Amino acid sequence: MVTIRPDEISSIIRKQIKQYNQEVEVVNIGIVLQVGDGIARIHGLDEVMAGELVEFEDGTVGIALNLESNNVGAVLMGDGLMIQEGSSVRATGKIAQIPVSDAYSGRVVNALAQPIDGRGKITASESRSIESPAPGIISRRSVYEPLQTGLIAIDSMIPIGRGQRELIIGDRQTGKTAVATDTIINQKGQDVICVYVAIGQKASSVAQVVNIFQERGAMEYTIVVAETADSPATLQYLAPYTGAALAEYFMYKEQHTLIIYDDLSKQARAYRQMSLLLRRPPGREAYPGDVFYLHSRLLERAAKLSSQLGEGSMTALPIVETQAGDVSAYIPTNVISITDGQIFLSADLFNAGIRPAINVGISVSRVGSAAQIKAMKQVAGKLKLELAQFAELEAFAQFASDLDRATQNQLARGQRLRELLKQSQSAPLTVEEQIATIYAGANGYLDILEIVQVRKFLVQLREYLITNKPQFGEIIRSTRAFTEQAEALLKEAIQEHIELFLLREQK
């Protein structure tokens, strides 16, 4: 028979009492009233904050956006197919955050910064809020360093600086994404981290862009954030902020970053869908009243930081799609007013074979020549004016039968200048190549050539300069100015090559 010793029992009870830890856990729980179309109405989340993450029974996460007197409207970050009426919801006490680290370079992730390229997990020890406040006035400095796109038309007439916001606007199928991807390709070797955010696009289009980056060796310094057309509206709305948070991580580490939002029209549509389903009052074009704030708080995060913060930068190239060239619609006018200039792509120019189809007349960079090296200013100073005069003269010449010699010469020069601005996709040019190209056109060296010969001549001239006059490129790179020595070398190269070229063409 087992004997029970009272002293042993009392010592066990004492030990248990000592180990007992009195903790009170307060959990804010609500009940789903209604769910559907990516929206859930919840009753009972009394102390929930605006923008707080809420967790449903099936593990789906949502964001509380509408705080009303008798219920909370939350948007779902998932399909929410397993959520039922009456199921419980828990407030997490957190706001949307993503992990950030250097390991994100070269990866394709979704709006929650989770990898979707099948290459395994991304290790990260830090995290950043998806919605971070933009740098203040004292934290910034004016834009002064150029960000070269590799496209002659942009770098010469609509220059972009590090820390600038430059809108790329145009109808569908006018080459907006091509301008953005060429800019990323041109950052190779420039120590710039690029973030490409694809919002509401076809998965095949995103795959095509990623393939271009991989082929051109651009993926190693690029992060792709993708939410395709079949993603929930909430994730399409969040994707640009996720991209901005990833770019900010590098910016505050004293690095230069470039972020492309492709495109903000689709983000605005996703936000409109969410707002209408949450029964927020519609405004112009059925967009909610705060759609301006949607884009302004995103684009204000792009900055050139002050020397105290390490002079890092975040350059934003948002893309907006227009309908039949209408830039006076709601979203285009909003984004134009927020950004520091716009690159306008024209369907008419694109169809006429002028690619990139940049309408130089109405495109502008408000930072302007502050973001250009001295050499480019010296060579391309009058280019925009000459092209504008040519466009005016060309329109007039259609109705005039007999033109004087000077007008004919001006038209011939303008046609050749327009020809030299044409560029193939994924073929960005270095600054010295651009300067040589513009100099040849602006100083009349191309006037003796037929229009069809211009591009062939320029390609061969650039090759001739690299092989026979390498000092020209060295002078431009080291002094960043178009010196007398550089001009003499370039003149010599052009004259030598024109003779060779004409001899070859006559054969």
UniProtKB/Swiss-Prot annotation:
The protein's location, in the record's own words, is: Plastid, Chloroplast thylakoid membrane
UniProt EC number: 7.1.2.2
Q: How does it sit in the membrane?
A: Peripheral membrane protein
Keyword field: ATP synthesis, ATP-binding, CF(1), Chloroplast, Hydrogen ion transport, Ion transport, Membrane, Nucleotide-binding, Plastid, Thylakoid, Translocase, Transport
In this chain, ATP is annotated as bound at: G170, D171, R172, Q173, T174, G175, K176, T177
Name the catalysed reactions. Answer: ATP + H2O + 4 H(+)(in) = ADP + phosphate + 5 H(+)(out)
Q: Read off the CDD domains from this record.
A: ATP-synt_F1_alpha_C, ATP-synt_F1_alpha_N, F1-ATPase_alpha_CD
Q: Which InterPro entries match?
A: ATP_synth_asu-like_sf, ATP_synth_asu_C, ATP_synth_asu_C_sf, ATP_synth_F1_a_nt-bd_dom, ATP_synth_F1_asu, ATPase_a/bsu_AS, ATPase_F1/V1/A1_a/bsu_N, ATPase_F1/V1/A1_a/bsu_N_sf
Keyword Transcription regulation among record annotations: no
Gene Ontology CC terms: chloroplast thylakoid membrane; proton-transporting ATP synthase complex
Q: Which GO terms describe its molecular function?
A: ADP binding; ATP binding; proton-transporting ATP synthase activity, rotational mechanism
Q: Residue numbers for the site described as Required for activity?
A: S363
- What Gene3D superfamilies does this protein's entry cite? 2.40.30.20, ATP synthase alpha/beta chain, C-terminal domain (1.20.150.20), P-loop containing nucleotide triphosphate hydrolases (3.40.50.300)
Keyword flag Transit peptide: no
UniProt xrefs under PROSITE patterns = ATPASE_ALPHA_BETA (PS00152)
How this chain assembles, per its entry, is: F-type ATPases have 2 components, CF(1) - the catalytic core - and CF(0) - the membrane proton channel. CF(1) has five subunits: alpha(3), beta(3), gamma(1), delta(1), epsilon(1). CF(0) has four main subunits: a, b, b' and c.
For this chain, the family text in UniProt reads: Belongs to the ATPase alpha/beta chains family.
Role noted for this protein: Produces ATP from ADP in the presence of a proton gradient across the membrane. The alpha chain is a regulatory subunit.
What the entry lists under PANTHER family is as follows: ATP SYNTHASE SUBUNIT ALPHA, MITOCHONDRIAL
Q: What is this protein called?
A: ATP synthase subunit alpha, chloroplastic
Q: What lineage is on file?
A: Eukaryota, Viridiplantae, Streptophyta, Embryophyta, Tracheophyta
